[in-house]
Amino acid sequence: MANLKEIRDRIVSVKNTRKITEAMRLVAAAKVRRAQDQVLKSRPFADKLARVLENIQSRVQFEAVDSPLLSKRNVKKISLVCITADRGLCGGYNTNIIKKVEIRYAELIKQGYEPNLILVGKKAIGYFQNRKDRYVIKSTFKELEQVPTAIDSEGITNDVLAEFLSENSDRVEIIYTKFITLVSCAPVVQTLLPLDPQGIAEDNDEIFRLTTKNSKLLVEKSNIEKNDSDKLPSDIVFEQSPDQLLDSLLPLYLQNQILRALQESAASELACRMTAMNNASDNAKELASTLNLTYNKARQAAITQEILEVVGGSAV
């Protein structure tokens, strides 16, 4: 059995570690709310943009419009945009998305395509750059804002557009982590190019709010109601031709799709970090309790041994 000093030092170390993990949990919890607020702020623009595109689509078939972002050509080269975090300590968040990319990459090769990677986040960059003999990397992006903004998505959008318009890629897919709940998220694959505009907000979207009760962190959730009262009127007249409108709107729509993926990934990362740090805090508390019990037993054994030695000495 370890001596009392070693046990006491370990108890102090575990308690200090618990303070750190608890602080990280609270910081992540606060940032999750910020990430969700950012999604809400960007949603009105995304919703309006989608409705304008839907209105144009109702008047002219996209297939008849001469826009390079809508053109569907024979697919040979496929770019995969992979979104991970810059940091760890977020459970299986980074591991799950990297596994999803590896599986998708292998599927495309098996089907006869030529995939390549556009990596976002230091974790993906570090992992795949160490395996350059197996993966083709086109470009990398790192050190984005913790709560992504349009500026963060602009650089990725420009790179994706350049790859597609130069025909270096015939299709672009994005692999990111979809935020479901504070304790649940899942890697998903979405086709970015060629574009196929559809609604942005879903009927069952939920927003999770962090509250406190009796000094404990709680989660409240509420459904988002889609507002159909501000739909564009059916008799609206566009001064420009559909081609001109789409050339202006489609890049914006693409950037918004990428921004949405970045925001969902950021919210998922923070939620995973909050959960991981919460589990770490609970484990540290349990370990400290076990060590305290061990310390008390060792101390009791030491006292008993001293008493026996005193009694034995007096008997002599």
Swiss-Prot record:
Topological relation to the membrane, as annotated: Peripheral membrane protein
Sorted UniProt keywords: ATP synthesis, CF(1), Hydrogen ion transport, Ion transport, Membrane, Thylakoid, Transport
A GO-annotated cellular component: proton-transporting ATP synthase complex
Subcellular location as annotated: Cellular thylakoid membrane
Entries under InterPro entries matching the protein: ATP_synth_F1_ATPase_gsu, ATP_synth_F1_gsu
Keyword Transport on entry: yes
Claim: Transport is one of the keywords in the record: yes
A GO molecular-function descriptor: proton-transporting ATP synthase activity, rotational mechanism
Disulfide bonds: none
Principal localisation: membrane
PANTHER family assigned to the protein according to its UniProt record, in alphabetical order: ATP SYNTHASE GAMMA CHAIN, ATP SYNTHASE GAMMA CHAIN, CHLOROPLASTIC
Function: Produces ATP from ADP in the presence of a proton gradient across the membrane. The gamma chain is believed to be important in regulating ATPase activity and the flow of protons through the CF(0) complex.
Family: Belongs to the ATPase gamma chain family.
Quaternary context: F-type ATPases have 2 components, CF(1) - the catalytic core - and CF(0) - the membrane proton channel. CF(1) has five subunits: alpha(3), beta(3), gamma(1), delta(1), epsilon(1). CF(0) has three main subunits: a, b and c.
Protein name (Swiss-Prot/TrEMBL): ATP synthase gamma chain
Species name: Prochlorococcus marinus subsp. pastoris (strain CCMP1986 / NIES-2087 / MED4)
